[in-house]
Amino acid sequence: MKKIALLVLLLTVGLVAGRAQESRQDVSISGSVLVEPWVTSTTDVSAGAKRAIGGLASYRFMLTPRGALEANYGFEQNNILYKGPTFLNGYKVNVRNQEITAAYVYNFTFRKFNPFVEGGGGALLWQSLRNEATTTLDLKNQTTIVGLYGAGVAYELSPSFDIRLEYRGILSKVPNFGDTLLNTNKYYNIYNPVIGVAYHF
């Protein structure tokens, strides 16, 4: 009888531990850099931007010991310069970017290092800001559907905390803010390195 009780206890502990492992979650806060490459197109309109510094907040839910679902919210502010045959001096658009994406993350484990890769998608919200850094244009806010991919590594500081370093790529159509004058009809790969701290619970 004692052996059966012990066996039931061990199975229960194992099941609870397994479920705890499967339901492990984490949140992370990171600093990010958004690098938009210079784009030229068949419409003779080109577009480019300075490097933008911002932030990224992420939440991960572990489906398995290696696989997780991730939700992201990012925020940056930048200037995009458009040039074309009829506006050689260019139009400067001051932009606030917001990222809302989700991805599947696959983790590897090597001692305290946890490399990972991810892929997913979502949306970028482009908000044109009216201020002295913006050329006067009748522009509208725009949302583009994006693809997301990335790879990085997490270094475990403790069972609850790790440092996370990642390169992310965001595939998006170049925005025109509702103005056909700014059409490039091009997609580009936005580079987005991030570094931050994650808390596991």
List where the protein language model places each region:
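A broad helix-preferring feature
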Residues: 11-16, 26, 68-70, 146-148, ...
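Gram-negative (and chloroplast) outer-membrane scaffold detector with strong preference
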Residues: 22, 58-133, 155-157, 188-201
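Transmembrane beta-strands of outer-membrane beta-barrel proteins
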Residues: 28-34, 72-74, 118-122, 166-168
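Surface-exposed strand-loop-strand hairpins of Gram-negative outer-membrane beta-barrel proteins
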Residues: 33-56, 142-143
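Outer-membrane beta-barrel translocator domains and adjoining extracellular loop/strand segments
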Residues: 39-46, 81-88, 127-136, 175-182
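Short sequence motifs at beta-strands and strand-loop junctions characteristic
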Residues: 47-52, 92-99, 141-146, 185-189
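A charged, solvent-exposed segment within the mature domains of Sec-exported extracytoplasmic proteins
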Residues: 126-169
